[in-house]
């Protein structure tokens, strides 16, 4: 078998006809500066070809569903295995997808509860026992005397099919009627029905039609017994006139599960009963999502204003006449409940607030007056603002109105199920004393301990008590058991053994990749890219496949240095199973642990696309041409700043933060500094900074419609004028967006073209040089430059427009030139070339210089934003912020800005961040990178662990002070950083005070805070 994967003549994107040999069944890391071609080689060439060859082997019919990848621009690839990509861009956005469902642990939980779960009555908590036919007969006669009844035996429940054969068989057996999907039919009629084959149906056999009289007990008992036998333990009884208002009512009886006191019946327990994606288990109110979009009083009411002053926001907006229409009713309501419409909302009594929002629930008198005279007097009702908005939202057919109303809504836990997603009768089924929602709500680590104790028969009440008070339901609450059962019994233990083994194996893999803090019910759309990737990595390790090529994109993202060892161990386990690993990575530990290292470069974009060095980590480390090698051997490094900024003496203070796992923490951020928030994965960093601090600042300073997490108060906001979050999200969602449009430089370039003699002679305005509007763009391709051709079972192809040949503009527009270049030529310039070309235009030259400063000189200014990496998008945003005049009152929030960045890129990034801080601005950065930590003025370390074991402030202070902290994991790793000398930690009570001006043992600070230096 070939022992090498050989790529010959790769020219995809910026690759320069490279040939590279990779050892098979080894752990290979590809590194290099951002934009050097790492992902192009790993994903767009090697993975794309592996996937394409596999899909091409399938039938043409199958290919049109899978989507064939385009053949990469490469001469040949040999030694290629089937490829699986584990990147960060395929996180599920489905609210039904959770950690448990993605890892398949939830599937095993459903099986466990269906096979060994103990059902209890959701009303009284009594253990549900079987019902015999005689007990069912007694219940019917006692509960519905002299009522007409139709006894039905369930034959089909929620299954697909046409059931013609079933109907024919039933007629031969002597039955006369059936009920199909809730409608009664003669069997002759039923046989003529054309049921949808691929839709789910319910079919019940009519056993008997009778009146429930004591004199007919023997007939009733006989029919009940037959019905239960024919329905395999279940019997439905339809009572046509026993319901409310004389309507129909239906009873369900089970030979197996029913509470003798309340009659609570549980259908036969099956795995689908415990799925929140199935109508058999899901809460009927929220359909198993666990949350509902509801109108938020916080978004509807401005508490600082009075009703007369416009407190009811949707009724005071321009164009909303509801305020005028309801004004007389509101005045009458105020008289009725004795409150003043001119009183600020926050000072109104709770009863008045409730009446305005939800209606008073009673009629009251309204007097209409016009010109001071009474014109009408009558009794009326007031539905309430929220009820009014709900009605309008349900009735409107206008997409615009729907979107406007959705701005006033937010996702809130379902009031019926309390966010558990399940019906109360499903929550009443327990294993080891806990229901399925309670076990899903545990962290991975707690769940592993619980199932181990269950497996070993060592469970007791003390072990499950911390989990009993939550996940019991909302208004449809499930009563706790009267008597708990902790063990499974001999039979149950034998049935559960293989299920528990499978659950614990998968939990162990999640622990190994550093995700022990996640709960199994955590929705997938709330996971970071790194977390989602490591979950899929754990799933792949659990699959036990061999001979596969795994291509991974920075699996260490979001991991604290303390968790890196476990991740690397998992990657090696995957390799040891007999797989090849190709990992795009910038983490130093991962590089040094690899079997083989490839360094791409030397620069980015047109300056990259070459293999600079390859070999073992030690060989690359000693390579004189390798930039990565210079950093690995310490010849180049990011220097520790000579001193820490003390800040401007003012603070932004958060008190009582307690969202998610935060444990009532107080933190102080010194303004005018670069503050880095650190801590293990899941310790509460994003909750504190994003969910509480950023959400509050965005609402108060920027007027955003955000809903912050739980906290007591935030002080110091008056010192700031705006908050800006600089993340790695795309700068635009369409190919029409590009660096030139985002930075605003395209507007200036178009204005420049309008001032050329030719444009003036023709009367062209700035719009003529836009490819987004009619006039100057090529109308054949609508300014896209390419035409999409659908190929059905072949991949769609994009070909240059045959009219403009990819230029995007029509011939007349391209006849206008500035310094011998058309507008299309200018958009095709790199930032470096554009900087030189527009040297005489200060406004454009300055913005190009800033893009150069952040390391984007290789990028074309007209490059579609959809092709930019997250790191590139973030640096464009940073350059745009640097181009603005510094006020010293802006706070910037960044979440792991070093994602996708090489050591050299981090150095450039730190230069830019230090420049922002030098302008007196405040930076708050969530980061695990030690180079960023050591460059900070102030650190806030959360922990000590993730999940329920985190959420507290472990240490605060300068990097030197945190390094001296005895229990901080961050401090432990900072102590190993050259140039950081541990200083005495400050007293805990001083955490909110002004950080000391700490000296670090480094050379005198130069103009740039972080610089590239040659080691002595």
From Swiss-Prot:
PROSITE patterns: ABC_TRANSPORTER_1, ABC_TRANSPORTER_2. Keywords: ATP-binding, Cytoplasm, DNA damage, DNA excision, DNA repair, DNA-binding, Excision nuclease, Metal-binding, Nucleotide-binding, Repeat, SOS response, Zinc, Zinc-finger. InterPro entries: AAA+_ATPase, ABC_transporter-like_ATP-bd, ABC_transporter-like_CS, P-loop_NTPase, UvrA, UvrA_DNA-bd, UvrA_inter. Residues 315-627, 647-975 form the ABC transporter domain. GO terms for cellular component: cytoplasm; excinuclease repair complex. ATP binds at residues 32-39, 679-686. SUPFAM superfamilies: P-loop containing nucleoside triphosphate hydrolases (SSF52540). NCBIfam families: PRK00349.1 (NF001503), uvra (TIGR00630). The UvrABC repair system catalyzes the recognition and processing of DNA lesions. UvrA is an ATPase and a DNA-binding protein. A damage recognition complex composed of 2 UvrA and 2 UvrB subunits scans DNA for abnormalities. When the presence of a lesion has been verified by UvrB, the UvrA molecules dissociate. This is UvrABC system protein A. It comes from Deinococcus radiodurans (strain ATCC 13939 / DSM 20539 / JCM 16871 / CCUG 27074 / LMG 4051 / NBRC 15346 / NCIMB 9279 / VKM B-1422 / R1).
